[in-house]
UniProtKB/Swiss-Prot annotation:
This is Large ribosomal subunit protein bL21. Transmembrane segments: none annotated. One of its GO terms (molecular function) is rRNA binding. Coiled coil: none annotated. It comes from Wigglesworthia glossinidia brevipalpis. It holds the Pfam family Ribosomal_L21p. Belongs to the bacterial ribosomal protein bL21 family. The gene is rplU. GO terms for cellular component: cytoplasm; ribonucleoprotein complex; ribosome. This protein binds to 23S rRNA in the presence of protein L20.
Length: 103
């Protein structure tokens, strides 16, 4: 069984017991979170779609760690002016482990 859920405007696909990397969410490491915005549930026998979300369903997950993503370099350059500016950016990410999908 797997589900498609939405957190902070982004949709993710998850199975029970899997680890999902998503944009940073607030919370301490080891704390339990409950996700109620489930858009679709896929089981062996049936498929359930929400309009837009499924009522009385939830995903229970724990926060494993907060990490930084891969560094992205941004370069500004002007020709013939001897100007070059390089900046970098790292996205903040959170790994969560899906414990249970309740429907």
């Amino acid at each position: 069984m797997y589900a498609i859920f939405k957190i902070n405007g982004v949709q993710y696909k998850a199975k029970s017991g899997s680890v999902v990397c998503l944009n940073k969410i607030s919370g301490d490491i080891g704390s339990t979170i409950e996700i109620k915005k489930i858009m679709a549930l896929f089981n062996d026998e049936k498929i359930i779609f929400g309009q837009p979300f499924i009522k009385n369903s939830r995903i229970i997950a724990t926060i494993k760690k907060h990490i930084n993503g891969k560094k992205i370099s941004i370069v500004k350059f002007s020709r013939r002016k001897h100007f070059k500016k390089i900046t970098g950016y790292r996205q903040k990410l959170t790994n969560i482990k899906i414990i249970d999908i309740c429907c």
